Amino acid sequence: MAHLIVTLLLLSVLTLATLDFTGAQAGVCYGRQGNGLPSPADVVSLCNRNNIRRMRIYDPDQPTLEALRGSNIELMLGVPNPDLENVAASQANADTWVQNNVRNYGNVKFRYIAVGNEVSPLNENSKYVPVLLNAMRNIQTAISGAGLGNQIKVSTAIETGLTTDTSPPSNGRFKDDVRQFIEPIINFLVTNRAPLLVNLYPYFAIANNADIKLEYALFTSSEVVVNDNGRGYRNLFDAILDATYSALEKASGSSLEIVVSESGWPSAGAGQLTSIDNARTYNNNLISHVKGGSPKRPSGPIETYVFALFDEDQKDPEIEKHFGLFSANMQPKYQISFN
């Protein structure tokens, strides 16, 4: 009996260690809107060589899903915005989508289904607002019907522009004109114990506000910049994240976790802010920082996906072409470590 107890304790310790290790891993966003990009099989090899254990893709690209078979890379799979109307229209359509893109790939480690990206009443994706929640519900029903409800969580990725009054972070709330949109989504996530996916970019905050110090955005400030009722903020990433947590709390979403589904820094495209040095500093500090928590949620880690794996020269505007960590020849644009 004593031997059995010792064995069980060792297994428990190993399991906890494994969970902590995987939880601390930053992933990458793998977009394909670029010329001359490597094959999906080569991309998977690149990720393995660089200790990248999580990936976000924005659509169910079959060659990519094939390349991920047996790879041990955990996947966030997107339902693209143009597909939302179809999967929202009927349960049968959603069942077919899940069968074709999830169930047919039983040896791919699906972690999340991101139903829609940056759908909002306030941007160019507003036409998808009426169908988003029903699309999420239908995909959830299909995932649950496949017996995968505990393994794969269904959510959607929002932009931080849905929040306001974000300084200090404890004042953060959702804008009045998005509450009717976001609150039913929050209720859905609470019911299904799924995280909210948030695309979080200190770069765009500082690009639109000259009063923000660069050190605060790059995680290099040596002192507290914002003091919020005893919580000290040395970086903008934590401030934006915790403002979003405050907004969730005010919308009956205090039980939710946030997964940062995109964050990155461009290396060119818009003047002095967009330099190789700034991109290297931000992304390396981001990967290190998210192994811990934020002032509001200090236990951490903060599951985060770095945008993006490659430059994508088919995207617009110009700034969107330059977020890549690697060049098309799979050489790092600058020194980057996921260890």
Swiss-Prot record:
This is Glucan endo-1,3-beta-glucosidase, acidic isoform PR-Q'. Belongs to the glycosyl hydrolase 17 family. Implicated in the defense of plants against pathogens. It comes from Nicotiana tabacum. One of its GO terms (cellular component) is apoplast. The keyword Hydrolase applies. Its EC number is 3.2.1.39. Induction: Accumulates following infection. It catalyses: Hydrolysis of (1->3)-beta-D-glucosidic linkages in (1->3)-beta-D-glucans. GO terms for biological process: carbohydrate metabolic process; defense response. Keywords: Apoplast, Glycosidase, Hydrolase, Plant defense, Pyrrolidone carboxylic acid, Secreted, Signal. It holds the Pfam family Glyco_hydro_17. The modification Pyrrolidone carboxylic acid is found at Q25. One of its GO terms (molecular function) is glucan endo-1,3-beta-D-glucosidase activity. Residues 1-24 form the signal peptide. Transmembrane segments: none annotated. The N-terminus is blocked.
